[in-house]
Amino acid sequence: MSAIPRTSIIMPVYNTASTVIAAIKSVLAQTDPDFELLVMIDGSPDNSVQLIAEYLQQNPDERVRVFNNPKNQGLSAMRNQGLDEARGEWVTFPDSDDALYPIFLERLHYHAERTGAQVVNCAHNMVATDGSTTQRLKGAPGTLTGQEAAFALLKDELSPYAWDKIIRRELFEGVRYPQIERAEDECALLDCYLRAQSVTVIDEPLYAYAVSAGSLTWSRITPLSETRRLLEYFEKSLQRTSTYHLLAGQEALTIARVIAYLNNAQQALIVGGESAPAVLAGCRAGFTVSDALLALRIRPVFGAAGLLLKTSMPLYRLLYGAYVKRVYNL
């Protein structure tokens, strides 16, 4: 491994003993060998630590560094620690229950060199518990300016994930993952896009994302206070740049607000429980009919869902629920 590897691969580990070795193997099988793997153990209560130690003892690799944090600190803290330790020119953040296809790095770097982009997004395969796969790509293949990518991200037109892309590490100077209970990936990514010159999207599925009920956004109800914190983060990020005063920036923030409350409401419908009615009421009050009408013009699915949430809960439950199940392979 060179003193400065091309890519730092930062992999948080928490309670994934059944999958973490396969995830590590998928990294070590990359056709582009110029990387370092930072395994960030987050106070995992299972035997992940032992399994990783045994595997690396039997298969030593100088490219792998393990950071065993005895106390659980959360996903954002692990990624931030990894960024502090990273030496690579690029970074990526695979989950320890997923897998990179062997050409993940090779193909993403090829397109980075081809376009000069500072971020390259790829498609991914969603792998269901029965082994079936569904390919998913958010965004049309091509290259956007950083500003265009930031607005597209807020409008749910680009992938908000940390694991299906490579990012120039320099974009993280002064940027870290916030301690927010939802969409921390999207928060940091928004800040990176606002700093980037260009962002490329490719339609090659290079990542296998394991769909499991325990890891889904839809397995718990996010407190309304966290949704408000998320939206405040988006607004402050744009306020730090000239994009905040642009009409396109304000429209993107409005659509992000509608989407955030729609998803929060859908969580409440799926999970249920005593808190669900209050959360649903808060989500309905979180945006205006004018907001939903704006979304209807630019992002029709979300605009229509917003109007239904405001006016007809049964229809909202039926139609937006079907959309969520299709998009997230539930």
Model-derived features: positions:
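Membrane-interface aromatic/basic loop that binds lipid-linked glycans or pyrophosphate carriers
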Residues: 269-330
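Nucleotide-sugar donor-binding/catalytic module of glycosyltransferases
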Residues: 1-227, 308
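TPR repeat positional signature
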Residues: 257-261
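Catalytic core of nucleotide-sugar-dependent glycosyltransferases
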Residues: 206-212, 219-251, 262-291
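Structural motif
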Residues: 244-255, 296-298, 302-306
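Juxtamembrane/interfacial segments around transmembrane helices
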Residues: 166, 238-244, 306-313
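General helical secondary-structure elements
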Residues: 2, 75, 103, 116, ...
